[in-house]
Amino acid sequence: MAAHVIDQRNAEKTLGNLSAAAVEALEQAALTTTYPTGAVLFAESQAPRGVFIVRRGRVKLSVSGSDGRTLILRIVEGGDILGAASVIAGREYEATAETQEPSEVSFIRQSDLLRLMRGSGEIALWVTQHLSSDYNCTCREIRDLMLSDSAGEKLARLMVGWLDHSGETKQSGQVKMALTHEEIGQMIGTSRETVSRLIAGFKKQNLIQQNGATLVIPNRMALESLITA
């Protein structure tokens, strides 16, 4: 892992809605590190050390049950803050954060973040906005998981969500599917075998096409027709 100061271009991308003074304050408190694939930033039930700001790459947030099963809550990309709720509340991290690919991540210690929030209403509002976004995202994901009647509907919801996230608003589009069938199963609460069977069925019905890691959805409305709730 290589540690270095925050790259200004990444700062503009991640902290672009903050004033120059607020960005500078955060930069001075942050240590940025390049992590390899599979690095654990923090673990579920671990005492909070600080927050992690994803500058580049992708990070998986997951929780584990007593039976050993894993549920992926979401995949985080550049611009998101991880661990803020635990740091502010002084409670254990509620999930495990693991890099999905080589990633550049900034770390700000708990004491430094709280100090910055007390001293700057702008930074406090910025953190609060991220917490609100996380809450809304969690509610939406719980709704999708609980109100879907079948694994097929959950998979359709997930793929339509990928289109929305990528900004594809047309009736057809393509996205990068950088998850294994096992990881997709962990996102929708089913087995790898079920995911493989469903994807094969979707292809047979021409609901999706796949070229390597590129997922093509030729008819969004056809895929959405599987979503009942």
Regions found by a protein language model. Give the residues of each.
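Cyclic nucleotide-binding regulatory module and flanking cytosolic helices
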Residues: 1-40, 81, 86-87
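Cyclic nucleotide-binding regulatory domains
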Residues: 14, 39-102
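Cyclic-nucleotide recognition modules
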Residues: 22-23, 74-136
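A residue-level structural signature of the nucleotidyltransferase/glycosyltransferase Rossmann-like core
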Residues: 51, 73, 105-106, 176, ...
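Residues that scaffold the ATP/ADP-binding catalytic core of kinase and kinase-like folds
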Residues: 62, 84-85, 115-116, 158, ...
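Polybasic "coupling" helices that flank or enter modular domains
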Residues: 118-189
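Phosphate-/nucleic-acid-contacting segments
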Residues: 158, 162-229
